[in-house]
Amino acid sequence: FALIGSKAEDGSGQLALFTSEDAIHWNYEKMIDQCKNRYGKMWECPDFFALDGCQVLIVSPQFMRAEGLEFHNGNNSIYFTGDYEKETMTYTRGDARQVDYGMDFYAPQTVETTDGRRVMIAWLQSWDNFMTPEDMDWTGLMTIPRELHVKDGSLVQLPVREIENYYTGERSYENVTLENQSAELDGITGRSFDMTVEVKKED
């Protein structure tokens, strides 16, 4: 099947479901979802997959309005969890949630790895803050791939384990005592860290 993001006559987002037996000739089936101006306008870059016993839908709506801390004005990436009835091609979903709260996260897509993991990668480039210098031969970048799971209806995201192959400068410290809520550790340099910390309160 193919899920095509589009917009209705009133400008609100909707998703058209197409099916094919040969990936060449396609048949339109139905509108599988419509936001009716509830979640932004045009729905872009849909992704639709089963994960941990439920059906996940990810879309990237344009021109959304902020709702407290949950969304921000402009282009967002949101997800729904729900149930999909294959026979009737009916999707029943819950409320939208933000995929990522960063302002430059857009158009996430997922793949299923050969060992069965669902991995997501997205585009880091805000359309509202296009700041690429003219002399650069590239614009934007991609996120670190994330392994996805669903827990209690929420999308859980973890960096893929393969990234550990690129770790350098490992350091280990034991029995570090915190004084005034802070401690300075020697030999730590770099811009990004992955830390595992075990904390024990003194008796």
Question: Language-model segments: what does each one mean?
Answer:
Residues F1-E9, L15-L17, Y28-M31, K36, ...:
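Hydrophobic core segments of beta-strands in well-ordered, beta-rich domains
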Residues K7-D10, G68-N73, M136-T139:
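Short consensus segments that form the blades of beta-propeller domains
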Residues S20-Y28, K86-T90:
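Asp-box/BNR beta-propeller loop motif
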Residues N37-W43, Y101-D104:
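Short glycine-/Asp-/Thr-/Trp-enriched loop segments that recur within the blades
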Residues L51-D52, M64-E85:
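Acidic, glycine-rich loop-and-beta core segments that form the ion-binding/anion-interacting portion
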Residues N75-D203:
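Beta-rich accessory regions
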